Design a protein with these regions (language model features):
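Acidic, polar-rich low-complexity tracts and alpha-helical solenoid repeat scaffolds
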Residues: 1-119
Length: 119
């Protein structure tokens, strides 16, 4: 459904998963992919809420690093450099070996350059 841009149907399915399995891995995945769907539609506040749900409700889930990175990207796109850098720092510090950390390092450099925050 995601690849076919059938976002409304996919979001409905993810909502059903969250309702049926509110505390399990399925819910964390559903929140994460809901965030991705909202991002694809440029619905940043909805995406932020979805990624924050992963971070707040599932602190040990494998999607934490990706969710923190996505939150940083949302803040970057919205022009919130300080908040973006804070999220990137969390990813880099806590998930140094992850793919998200590598992406966060690149995004961090870009934000610092754009904000004249280069050390």
């Amino acid at each position: 459904l995601f690849e076919e841009s059938r976002y409304a149907e996919a979001l409905e399915l993810f909502t059903e998963i969250i309702i049926a399995f509110p505390f399990g891995d399925y819910a964390a995945e559903a929140y994460f992919w809901s965030g991705e769907l909202f991002l694809a539609q440029l619905k940043y506040e909805d995406a932020k809420l979805s990624f924050l749900s992963v971070v707040d409700q599932f602190p040990d889930h494998e999607r934490i690093s990706d969710s923190l990175y996505k939150l940083g990207e949302i803040e970057r796109v919205q022009g919130n450099a300080t908040e973006a850098l804070s999220y990137y720092s969390k990813v880099i510090t806590n998930f140094a070996e992850s793919g998200a950390a590598q992406l966060a390092k690149k995004s961090e450099e870009i934000v610092k350059e754009q904000s004249n925050l280069v050390e």
